[in-house]
Structures are given as structure tokens and as C-alpha cells.
A protein has these predicted regions:
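N-terminal cationic and glycine-rich segments that engage phosphates or anionic surfaces
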Residues: 2-119, 126-492
Length: 492
């Protein structure tokens, strides 16, 4: 009897802890009206983006008997990164893809590779504004090129392996002016509308607007994998085969959950380098030192996204050229440079690996870290300030970048590796989608919690100023109260 009472008390304690956890991390946040407005504003713009993504371009008819972008690797990646608007060939079909491509190119350009852009990036707010103008100009160019390629590809049947025409232009709109000018500029306008929504989310909502809209596209496309898996393994089966199908489906769900947990661990993992400040005194314990946190994956998910666009977009143009002007050379390239073919898979994996290392070194901003060390009289114990510190940090960041390069290469290429082994493409969840799902979710939750804490501190400071009097003087001069306050304060 006591055994069952103990089990019951443990179960009740478990659920009470879960309730307290949600109350602490989620419910309390919604009591903050300012934060609640930001969250609701973000959700509203996400709904607007999804709604616009269901509106097909004027003058076009989407053929419902084919899966839009089925069998084409570029458009599957394009649809995920762009925000999912390509499914219905909507007003926002291009999504944020042109803007992301331009932003990554400008990230490369702000290094020593392009000295004028590097000087602009170091010239303060004025230079930052000029870089933004250049980024938007590149976005317009990329959006126009991608719009023409997408329209021509979908209307000629080059978007899938069966050469089926996925989009039909209605007879009254089937004119060169409409195809080559009106439709492309509508898609370009849709891209800048999407950028506008993302900027509003960044400024007035929660999280990074670009990441939130990409996450929206992932959330839209992700359920289809589970539906396809259910139909594949369970479907209309009965008896023993049904049991085996249920087991396979459960294993599939568990495998996805394990991958998500692994990605979560790698996303939050960091290398802590202990720091010492001149004049503070040397601490005997490492745990008492401040530290420099370096992300285990400093480049994030951008290497996979950029490598995907870099490798697949030229192949999409090659596919379109082969439709217009067939030749043995273009046919061979289409056959062998697909991502699920050995040559294409190797090129894709090597691209992810090299871009990860480059972006990892670029995003770490080593020169800025060393400069701050010199200004604040900070040094790493056992390492001399100056060139030795810079060399030490470079070696650490390079090792982290190489490790994350292997990690991202496995995640990005595994989808096409399993496809090359014969697995159905509609059952293989993209590692890119899972990385985006996990990283954006964690970063958004952390930003919500940070805003909640900062607003609470601001509110507490205001209340302290208003109530400052004899009682607060007594509290400030009481050593015991002062010690408790310091111990419970938040360093911001």
C-alpha cells in the first residue's frame, strides 16, 4: 500500500514540477502586456505571410495533379528557405531567398576579399547604411533573375523529373510582356514585401524576422513528412503488417526526436575560455573567473543554406537551358550533378565544409575580440597579450569551425546520401529544416526570456526610485539585506 502511495506522490510531484516550469518560463511572460503585444504582433505577421503564400499569381493555374517542385532538389530547398510560398506559386514564391543570398555575399565582401566594402563596414553607421543599400540592390538583381528562372522553369516542365508543366498560363495572359515583365516584377515586389514583414517582426515583434519567416516555411512543410511516413508504413494495412508498420512509424518518430535533441545540444554548446583582468587579482579557482564563450558551431545554419543555393541554382539554369536547347553536355550535367548522385553529393558536401570554416572564422570577429581585450586590460591566463592571444584564439576558433564543418556536412548531406541509397525522398526529413527549426526556436525563446527579465528589472528600478525613503535607507544600510540583494540580482 505504501508502495502505491509513494508512486502516486512521485507522479503528482512530477506533474507539479512541469506546471511550475511552464508557469515560470511561459505563463508569467504573458502577464507582461508589452511582451504579449510583441508576441501577438509576431504571430499576426506570420499568419499574414502564410495567407499571402496561398494566393496564386494572377493569370496562372497551378496543376493540382502534380506536386509543385516534386523531384527537383533546387525547388525543394528554395521552398524551405523561401518560407514555403512556392507550393502554390504565390505572390511570395521567392520569399527571402534573394535577400539571404545577397546578405551572405555581403558577409563575404566585408572581409579582406573586397577592401572597399570592408572599409565601409568599419566606417560606422554611415557605412552601415551604404552596405544596406548595396544589399537591397543585390536583392533586386537576384530576385529578378530567380523570378525569370522560376517562371520559365515551371511553365516549361523543367521543374520536375517528369517534365510535366506544373503551372499553366491562362490564354488571355499568355503574352511575352506578361511572362517576361509583369510576372517577374510581381515576384520581386513579393520579395520586398516579405523583407518588410521580416523587418517589422525584428523591430516590433520577438526574434529575428528573417529567421522567423524561414521557420514559418519549415513549420508548413514539416507535417507533410510525417503524413507521408504514416501513409507509407501504416496506410491501409491490417494484421501483422499493420503491427510492423506501426513499429516502423514509431521508430521514425523517435529517430527524428533524437536528431532534434542532438541538434539542440550542439546549438547551445560552447567552449568557455577563462579570462583574467589586470588589477583584479589572480583567482585560485577557474570557476571564479569570467570567461569568453565561443559557440561550438559559430557559423550557424547559413553554410548549408548558402551551399544549397550555390550548388543547385546553376543546375536549375542548366536544366532550363537543356529544355530550350538540348545537348549531350547539359544532359550529362543534369544526370550526374544532382545532389543524390556521387559527383553532386561530393561537391555539395565539400561546399558546406569550406563555407562553414570560412563563415566560422568570419562570424567570430577575432580582431574585435583582441581589440576589446587590449582596451579592457583583459588576458587569458597562461597566454601573453597581443599576438600570442590572437594566435591562440585563432587556433581554438579554427578547431571549432572544423568540428562544426563535419557536423553540418553530415546534417546537410545525409538527406541526399540516404536518397542515393534508395530511400524515398518524401520520407527523408531535411537536416537543414531540423537545424532551422531548433536554432530559431531556441533563439526566439531566449530573446523572449531576456526581454521579460530586462523589463522586470526596468520596472523594479522605477518602483525603487518612487519608493525611495526611510525604509529603503534602512534596507540599504542593513548588511544582511544588502548581501541578500546582491546575491539575487541579475547582472545585465
Amino acid at each position: 500500500m505504501n508502495f502505491f502511495k509513494k508512486i502516486g506522490s512521485n507522479i503528482s510531484l512530477f506533474f507539479s514540477r512541469i506546471i511550475l516550469f511552464f508557469q515560470k518560463h511561459f505563463i508569467d511572460h504573458f502577464k507582461n502586456k508589452v511582451l504579449l503585444k510583441r508576441i501577438l504582433f509576431t504571430l499576426f505577421l506570420m499568419v499574414v505571410f502564410v495567407t499571402v503564400g496561398t494566393l496564386t499569381l494572377p493569370g496562372l493555374k497551378v496543376n493540382q495533379d502534380t506536386s509543385l517542385s516534386g523531384g527537383n532538389e533546387f525547388f525543394n530547398i528554395f521552398n524551405t528557405i523561401g518560407g514555403g510560398g512556392l507550393r502554390q506559386f504565390s505572390l511570395v514564391s521567392l520569399g527571402l531567398s534573394p535577400f539571404i543570398t545577397s546578405s551572405i555575399i555581403m558577409t563575404f565582401a566585408q572581409t579582406k576579399l573586397v577592401p572597399p566594402i570592408q572599409r565601409l563596414s568599419q566606417s560606422g553607421p554611415h557605412g552601415r547604411i551604404k552596405i544596406n543599400y548595396i544589399t537591397y540592390g543585390l536583392t533586386f538583381v537576384f530576385a529578378l533573375v530567380q523570378a525569370i528562372v522560376v517562371i520559365q522553369t515551371f511553365t516549361t516542365g523543367a521543374a520536375n523529373n517528369q517534365n510535366q508543366q506544373l503551372v499553366t498560363i491562362l490564354d488571355q495572359f499568355n503574352t511575352p510582356v506578361f511572362i517576361w515583365f509583369v510576372l517577374p516584377f510581381i515576384l520581386v515586389a513579393g520579395t520586398f514585401f516579405t523583407i518588410f514583414i521580416s523587418e517589422q517582426i525584428t523591430n516590433k515583434g520577438v526574434g529575428n524576422g528573417t529567421s522567423i519567416l524561414i521557420l514559418t516555411g519549415v513549420l508548413i512543410t514539416l507535417p507533410s513528412y510525417f503524413i507521408n511516413a504514416y501513409k507509407h508504413w501504416i496506410g491501409d494495412l491490417t494484421g501483422k503488417k499493420l503491427f510492423e508498420g506501426v513499429i516502423s512509424f514509431v521508430v521514425f518518430i523517435i529517430s527524428v526526436a533524437i536528431v532534434i535533441l542532438i541538434i539542440s545540444f550542439f546549438h547551445q554548446a560552447e567552449r568557455k575560455i577563462p579570462l583574467q583582468h589586470i588589477g583584479v587579482g589572480r583567482s585560485k579557482h577557474v570557476k571564479d573567473l569570467s570567461y569568453l564563450p565561443l559557440k561550438l558551431n559559430p557559423a550557424g545554419v547559413m553554410p548549408i543554406i548558402f551551399a544549397s543555393m550555390l550548388v543547385t541554382f546553376p543546375m536549375m539554369i542548366t536544366n532550363l537551358v537543356n529544355q530550350k536547347f538540348p545537348s549531350p553536355g547539359t544532359a550529362w550535367m543534369i544526370e550526374n550533378f544532382a545532389l543524390h548522385k556521387p559527383i553532386g553529393l561530393v561537391i555539395y558536401a565539400v561546399s558546406i565544409f569550406l563555407i562553414t570554416i570560412f563563415l566560422g572564422l568570419q562570424q567570430s570577429r577575432l580582431d574585435k575580440i583582441v581589440e576589446d581585450f587590449n582596451k579592457n586590460s583583459t588576458f587569458i591566463p597562461g597566454i601573453r597579450p597581443g599576438e600570442q592571444t590572437e594566435a591562440y584564439l585563432m587556433a581554438v576558433i579554427l578547431r571549432l569551425s572544423i568540428f562544426s564543418a563535419f557536423y553540418l556536412t553530415i546534417l546537410g548531406a545525409s538527406q541526399y546520401f540516404f536518397q542515393a541509397l534508395g530511400s524515398p525522398p518524401n520520407l527523408i526529413i531535411s537536416g537543414t529544416s531540423l537545424v532551422i527549426l531548433v536554432s530559431v526556436s531556441i533563439e526566439t525563446i531566449q530573446q523572449i526570456q531576456a526581454r521579460h527579465k530586462s523589463q522586470n528589472i526596468f520596472k523594479t528600478n522605477n518602483q525603487t526610485k518612487k519608493s525611495f525613503g526611510f525604509s529603503s535607507l534602512v534596507k540599504a544600510t542593513n548588511p544582511q539585506n544588502q548581501q541578500n540583494d546582491n546575491g539575487g540580482s541579475i547582472l545585465w
